[in-house]
Structure formats: structure tokens, C-alpha cells
UniProtKB/Swiss-Prot annotation:
Family: Belongs to the NDK family.
UniProt keyword tRNA processing, yes or no: no
Protein name per the record: Nucleoside diphosphate kinase
Domain of life: Bacteria
Organism: Nitrosomonas eutropha (strain DSM 101675 / C91 / Nm57)
Gene name as annotated: ndk
Pfam families: NDK
Length: 141
């Protein structure tokens, strides 16, 4: 099995619900280690740059507005198959379609306020991690 790193963001809705610790417990129970973390209130430019891949999509403006609506918790997770494992923990993008017991099924309101973001591939994980953390701030443990 391959040890990977993935970027995870606990979005403003979940931060406001005070469920950061419950989400971290799920990461750790699944064998994922937090190797970098910080809380931030994203600027409009940061959110637009982070989600630039969606710039032409109809939901882009609302996504950016949501992501700057309050603080987020940003972390790098490390572990065997971390990307797939985190995506399984998160559940489907639409919480109504997410399996029971996933983060989105348990903590998300709707497809827009869906509690968490996770990288979808090793290439995007590397780019997303670099967006928020210089390599000197990521510690294997």
C-alpha cells in the first residue's frame, strides 16, 4: 500500500457547528494522521484561486461566497491510500446521497454547505497542499 498525503478542508458550516474534533476523530480512527493544520478565514482571492478549476461552472460564485463566509480548518492528512480513505470518510458531495455514517451524511446541510473538501487525486493533492502549506510546515509522524 502507498502512503499518500491529501488536503482536507473542514468548511465554514462544519466549523460553525463545532464538529472539528468529531471530524478529526474520524480521520484518526481510519488511520489517517494530521501532519499539518491551521485555521484560516479565506480571502476572496484565496478562495477563487483554490477553486479556479470551477471558475466557469455556474456554482463558482456561490462556492466562493460560502468558503469566505467564516473560518475553515485546513489540514494535510497522511496515511495508506489517504486520498481514497478520506473521500470514503467524506461521503458523496450531496449529503442526501451520502452513505449513513459519513461526514457529509452526519454534518452537512446540503450540496452547497457540505462540511468538507478533500483532494481527488495525487496530482491535485500536491497542488492543493502547496496552496496552503510550504513543505517545511508538513511533518511526517
Amino acid at each position: 500500500m502507498v502512503v499518500e498525503r491529501t488536503l482536507s478542508i473542514i468548511k465554514p458550516d462544519a466549523v460553525a457547528k463545532n464538529v472539528i474534533g468529531q471530524i478529526y476523530a474520524r480521520f484518526e480512527a481510519a488511520g489517517l494522521k494530521v501532519v499539518a493544520a491551521r485555521m484560516a478565514h479565506l480571502s476572496r482571492v484565496e478562495a477563487e484561486n483554490f477553486y479556479a478549476i470551477h471558475r466557469e461552472r455556474p456554482f463558482f460564485k456561490d462556492l466562493v461566497e460560502f468558503m469566505i463566509s467564516g473560518p475553515v480548518m485546513i489540514q494535510v492528512l497522511e496515511g495508506e491510500n489517504a486520498i481514497a480513505k478520506n473521500r470514503e470518510l467524506m461521503g458523496a458531495t450531496d449529503p442526501k446521497k451520502a452513505e449513513k455514517g459519513t461526514i457529509r451524511a452526519d454534518f452537512a446541510e446540503n450540496i452547497d454547505a457540505n462540511a468538507v473538501h478533500g483532494s481527488d487525486a495525487p496530482e491535485t493533492a500536491a497542488v492543493e497542499i502547496a496552496c496552503f502549506f510550504p513543505s517545511l510546515e508538513v511533518y511526517s509522524r
